[in-house]
């Protein structure tokens, strides 16, 4: 990265807006929640500051270290937070940045032309929510140090504690304040996935993750010189591309927004490739933040594909005027794409930054991608024909499946439209209703008898669930079990899926605790992920946890849910005589047992299905359920030891 910039990063770059007191009162407003997700968000805030420094052209390496007792350390080799006295606070700029909300370089467009933070409050918020917060700044050949306690109270002003002529940058250590935050463990998988994503999105920056916690002791490094091209390559590792090339382009521009009298800088990168799959794997980002609801950058990208491929299809006689247009949905089939824009003045729709709203981005992206794809088609006619043929095939498949789709999208509350095998609940109150998807008629019969009919519905699956990863839309929507699921849930399928129409608040998958049951679970989850993604995204999908064993002793029964729990019980009761029954299937339990162990809200355990990284989940579903055997074997070998529940 270039370290010789004409602009100076000093106290003059730091703008001060307001104090910190609100953060401890309402932490959810600043980091989303106080649970495990909030704990991880605190890490992201500090890492994002370091990445912003790299994006501004200073430094090459960001290192995260987890230590025992919840201590987190983030270090970079950027310029270091300014250490001079700030004119408005009469304190060091380091202390100003870390104790005053909205005081940060992100508010000075000369300092950071593009950054992830909409408000620039990250470091001070983390300080406010930490019991201990320590900062070392290597700058101007000196080592500066300041320490805060109990939500941002400085122990003493910034001091010089040594010299170092070879090193520059910032090192921060913090421990969350568990009088505010809930005490969860840091999840190394979630952290590693996010850091790897940052490495893909910021080519040439090295990321290091050291987990030094007791019993962990791992080190991972990421450096992707190919950036988002390598991201697409990674996502397609278990897929079969129909063209060998990854289409890639980037462009930087400055535009003036007349209504705001403001000049903005935009840097766009796009990389995409078509595969022989049936699903859309498009992921968009603005300033490294995943915009999972899309926005103007995605709209511009799709508009460009729509314009160029439809024009090419007509010119080369792949379709006639009477066939109609290839839709944007058709063009998304088998597409893997990364759209990454860096913007100096991003405008998001909603507090969570999940949709980009800048109107100037739409035209900029459309223009760049149109020019890129048009040139690619001109220079690569064979690949252009394959891409177009894929889109045309998707169009005709869609048209053939429309009748099947229509029958699956009937009004959810018309009893005549509900499948005959569904034992529906009495209530029409979606907020309390539950749908149990049960494996087989035998278990379905016990579930129907044992349920609370008022709010629990039962849908037994008789046939084999289709692996939607390997099927086109026409085949999927002709499958009886799939049609039954769609009709029972009542909300349609992507892209018209509507959460407002779901008939049940909880969709609970209840299968046997064996290999076949696990296979049915993953088939159902694949369908929900590909065709009803908001169900998972908004937390409506659950996995029931039926017992593995029944221990009978002293004229009483105890239900046990794992081998580890069984061993624990044996160790605690070494002299007790008992009988042990292992449940091979749900059908071995009568209705009373099934209610007591698996369906009674007062006693049952449900696992909520959640997704932290949609792109990574996409890759995993493709790997596990796709055609490629070798990557699937590698994945299983790599992850087998970390699986807590597996039945061979």
From Swiss-Prot:
Heterotetramer, composed of two GyrA and two GyrB chains. In the heterotetramer, GyrA contains the active site tyrosine that forms a transient covalent intermediate with DNA, while GyrB binds cofactors and catalyzes ATP hydrolysis. This is DNA gyrase subunit B. NCBIfam families: gyrB (TIGR01059), PRK05644.1 (NF004189). SUPFAM superfamilies: ATPase domain of HSP90 chaperone/DNA topoisomerase II/histidine kinase (SSF55874), Ribosomal protein S5 domain 2-like (SSF54211), Type II DNA topoisomerase (SSF56719). It comes from Mycoplasmoides gallisepticum (strain R(low / passage 15 / clone 2)) (Mycoplasma gallisepticum). It is found in: Cytoplasm. Keywords: ATP-binding, Cytoplasm, DNA-binding, Isomerase, Magnesium, Metal-binding, Nucleotide-binding, Topoisomerase. Mg(2+) 2 binds at residues 512, 514. Few gyrases are as efficient as E.coli at forming negative supercoils. Not all organisms have 2 type II topoisomerases; in organisms with a single type II topoisomerase this enzyme also has to decatenate newly replicated chromosomes. GO terms for biological process: DNA topological change; DNA-templated DNA replication. PROSITE patterns: TOPOISOMERASE_II (PS00177), TOPRIM (PS50880). Its cofactor is Mg(2+); Mn(2+); Ca(2+). Mg(2+) 1 binds at residues 439, 512. It catalyses: ATP-dependent breakage, passage and rejoining of double-stranded DNA. One of its GO terms (molecular function) is metal ion binding. Belongs to the type II topoisomerase GyrB family. One of its GO terms (cellular component) is cytoplasm. Its EC number is 5.6.2.2. CDD domains: HATPase_GyrB-like (cd16928), TopoII_Trans_DNA_gyrase (cd00822), TOPRIM_TopoIIA_GyrB (cd03366).
């Amino acid at each position: 990265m270039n370290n010789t910039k004409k602009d100076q990063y000093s106290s003059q770059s730091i703008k001060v807006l307001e104090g910190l007191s609100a953060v401890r009162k309402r932490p959810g407003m600043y980091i989303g929640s106080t649970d495990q997700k909030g704990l991880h968000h605190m890490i992201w805030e500090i890492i994002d500051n370091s990445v912003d420094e790299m994006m501004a052209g200073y430094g090459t390496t960001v290192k995260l270290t987890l230590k025992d007792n919840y201590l987190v350390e983030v270090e970079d080799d950027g310029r270091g937070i300014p250490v001079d006295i700030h004119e408005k606070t009469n304190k060091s700029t380091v202390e100003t940045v870390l104790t005053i909300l909205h005081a940060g370089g992100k508010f000075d467009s000369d300092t950071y032309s593009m950054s992830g933070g909409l408000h620039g409050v990250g470091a001070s918020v983390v300080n406010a929510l930490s019991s201990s917060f320590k900062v070392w700044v290597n700058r101007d050949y000196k080592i500066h140090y300041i320490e805060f306690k109990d939500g941002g109270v400085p122990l003493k002003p910034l001091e010089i504690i040594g010299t170092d002529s070879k090193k520059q940058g910032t090192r921060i250590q913090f421990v969350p304040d568990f009088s505010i935050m809930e005490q969860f463990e840091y999840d190394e998988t979630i952290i590693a996935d996010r850091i790897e994503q940052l490495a893909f999105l910021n080519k040439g920056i090295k990321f290091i993750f050291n987990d030094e916690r007791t019993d962990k002791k791992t080190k991972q490094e990421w450096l992707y010189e190919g950036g988002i091209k390598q991201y697409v390559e990674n996502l397609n590792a278990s897929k079969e591309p129909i063209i060998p090339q990854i289409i890639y382009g980037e462009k930087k521009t400055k535009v003036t927004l007349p209504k705001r009298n403001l000049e903005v800088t935009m840097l766009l990168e796009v990389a995409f490739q078509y595969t022989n799959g049936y699903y859309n794997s498009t992921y968009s980002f603005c300033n490294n933040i995943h915009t999972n609801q899309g926005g103007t950058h995605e709209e511009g990208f799709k508009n460009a594909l729509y314009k160029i491929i439809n024009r090419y299809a007509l010119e080369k006689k792949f379709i006639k005027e009477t066939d109609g247009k290839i839709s944007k949905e058709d063009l998304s089939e088998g597409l893997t794409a990364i759209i990454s824009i860096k913007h100096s003045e991003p405008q998001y729709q909603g507090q969570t930054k999940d949709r980009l709203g800048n109107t100037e981005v739409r035209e900029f992206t459309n223009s760049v991608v149109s020019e890129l794809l048009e040139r690619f088609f001109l220079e690569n006619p064979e690949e252009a024909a394959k891409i177009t043929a894929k889109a045309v095939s998707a169009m005709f498949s869609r048209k053939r499946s429309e009748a099947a789709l229509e029958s699956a999208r009937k009004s959810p509350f018309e009893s005549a439209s509900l499948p005959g095998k569904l034992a529906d609940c009495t209530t029409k109150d979606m907020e309390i209703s539950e749908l149990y998807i049960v494996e087989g008629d035998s278990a379905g019969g016990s579930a129907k008898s044992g349920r609370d009919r008022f709010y629990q519905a039962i849908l037994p699956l008789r046939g084999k669930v289709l692996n939607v990863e390997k099927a086109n839309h026409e085949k999927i929507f002709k499958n009886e079990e799939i049609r039954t699921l769609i009709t029972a849930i009542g909300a349609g399928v992507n892209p018209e899926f509507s959460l407002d129409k779901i008939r049940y608040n909880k969709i609970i998958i209840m299968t046997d605790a064996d290999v076949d049951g696990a296979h049915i679970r993953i088939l159902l989850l694949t369908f929900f992920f590909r065709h009803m993604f908001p169900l998972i995204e908004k937390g409506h999908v659950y996995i029931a946890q039926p017992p593995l064993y029944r221990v009978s002793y002293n004229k009483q029964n105890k239900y046990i849910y794992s081998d580890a729990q069984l061993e624990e019980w044996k160790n605690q009761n070494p002299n007790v005589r008992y009988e042990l029954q292992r449940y091979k299937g749900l059908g071995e339990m009568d209705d009373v047992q099934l209610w007591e162990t698996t369906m009674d809200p007062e006693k049952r355990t449900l696992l909520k299905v959640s997704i932290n990284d949609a792109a990574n989940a996409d890759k995993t579903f493709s790997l596990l359920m796709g055609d490629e055997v070798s990557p699937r074997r590698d994945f299983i070998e790599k992850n087998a030891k970390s699986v807590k529940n597996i039945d061979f």
